[in-house]
Amino acid sequence: MNYFPWLTIIVVFPIFAGSLIFFLPHKGNRVIRWYTICICILELLLTTYAFCYHFQSDDPLIQLVEDYKWINFFDFHWRLGIDGLSIGPILLTGFITTLATLAAWPITRDSRLFHFLMLAMYSGQIGSFSSRDLLLFFIMWELELIPVYLLLCMWGGKKRLYSATKFILYTAGGSVFLLMGVLGVALYGSNEPTLNFETSVNQSYPVVLEIIFYIGFFIAFAVKSPIIPLHTWLPDTHGEAHYSTCMLLAGILLKMGAYGLIRINMELLPHAHSIFSPWLMIIGTIQIIYAASTSLGQRNLKKRIAYSSVSHMGFIIIGISSLTDTGLNGALLQIISHGFIGAALFFLAGTTYDRIRLVYLDEMGGIASPMPKMFTMFSSFSMASLALPGMSGFVAELIVFFGIITGQKYLLIPKILITFVMAIGMILTPIYSLSMSRQMFYGYKLFNAPKDSFFDSGPRELFLSISIFLPVIGIGIYPDFVLSLAVDKVEVILSNFFYR
């Protein structure tokens, strides 16, 4: 057990420091912005220091463990710990949240509340990734939803109330199943109810009961991921949310669903996952094709990017269901890769809207000439999204492909069919991605329009875009930097499917 509470400080610090925003002197929004950015930078530095000097990547066991008794009545503990599976998403959360606060610089209305909600969301996300107690995981999961709902309601577009209501109905409905699964696992199989994740992992369940638990957890995580047909909240939410909120949604929130599938459905319930994995493989394949085809028909720029996110999540589902080291490592790499790329695309879409005040692609065109920097950055991230070699998306999708081909669970003909359909999906990706760039930047619709508001990217936008682009290129050139974090943990998880 760790004697210095690194993880507790990392989880609590953002929301605690964020609550002090309301006590800052009224000296304009600039003080609040810089205060929030400093908190995020300090948190990211603290996290990086703790992981660099106190985390050993070659150890698959839980590290930096903290266990404090909280409520004696039903053995509820404040229990935190990290392993190779959670370190990547936690660092991604810190990086994207820091950049999202910088992206939110133009926000002036109710600035204190806005930045507090972003920091509260930060704590909830890190708490979810580091929880080793099932009920604590559920509490952190819910803590992260409330700020998103308020950010949507108060700083969204014209249809923000509809989108926020749809978001909360879907996610709250999924949370009911999550709570039922948590309580079911806690109450089964021991004289005293336990919420300890380590104890639950070593517990054996009857197959029927394990399937019931699996379905409950799967519904909760399928809403968040999202997995079709529980994805319809996502395009509406992205279409109305402020682009800094979209960065957090695409970069982190969707990845929480994928993390939950691996952490709970796969690690906690391996027998049920083995039964359901062929169906997950089919769903993931359909999702890639369906979302890519639907994205092509979207007029709204942000909705087109949202459907592209749904399509890319299909690769993660396929990697999780492949039951191979290679496939699962590819899924984890895709989680990190798409976290960067999705956040960047939504940021650039939002900053473009700030300049031209248009959101429909068929009304755009010809803005490459007055905004060459914006054109260059958007084109670069579009290339990353369509998995151009040398960028992180290419490596992640290629590893998922190898995971399916080398898997022993599936017969040769199904593997060939799935690979063929996935390849079709990869062909559709450049079609909708490149057509999006063509409609925005080429043509003549806005070519002769007054250029007063068509100012190009400033230092803030350039810094933010380059900060995201560097890890996309870095992971594409040297993916082992990310893969080495989780490779031992992946072997431990998959050993349950063959030796348990």
Swiss-Prot record:
The keyword Plastid applies. Belongs to the complex I subunit 4 family. This is NAD(P)H-quinone oxidoreductase chain 4, chloroplastic. One of its GO terms (molecular function) is NADH dehydrogenase (ubiquinone) activity. It catalyses: a plastoquinone + NADH + (n+1) H(+)(in) = a plastoquinol + NAD(+) + n H(+)(out); a plastoquinone + NADPH + (n+1) H(+)(in) = a plastoquinol + NADP(+) + n H(+)(out). It is a multi-pass membrane protein. NCBIfam families: NDH_I_M. PANTHER family: NAD(P)H-QUINONE OXIDOREDUCTASE CHAIN 4, CHLOROPLASTIC, NADH-UBIQUINONE OXIDOREDUCTASE CHAIN 4. Its EC number is 7.1.1.-. The chain crosses the membrane at residues 4-24, 35-55, 87-107, 113-130, 134-154, 167-187, 208-228, 242-262, 272-292, 305-325, 330-350, 386-406, 411-431, 462-482. Its main location: plastid. One of its GO terms (biological process) is ATP synthesis coupled electron transport. Pfam families: Proton_antipo_M (PF00361). It is found in: Plastid, Chloroplast thylakoid membrane. One of its GO terms (cellular component) is chloroplast thylakoid membrane. It comes from the Eukaryota. It comes from Nicotiana tomentosiformis. The keyword Membrane applies. The lineage of its organism: Eukaryota, Viridiplantae, Streptophyta, Embryophyta, Tracheophyta. Keywords: Chloroplast, Membrane, NAD, NADP, Plastid, Plastoquinone, Quinone, Thylakoid, Translocase, Transmembrane, Transmembrane helix.
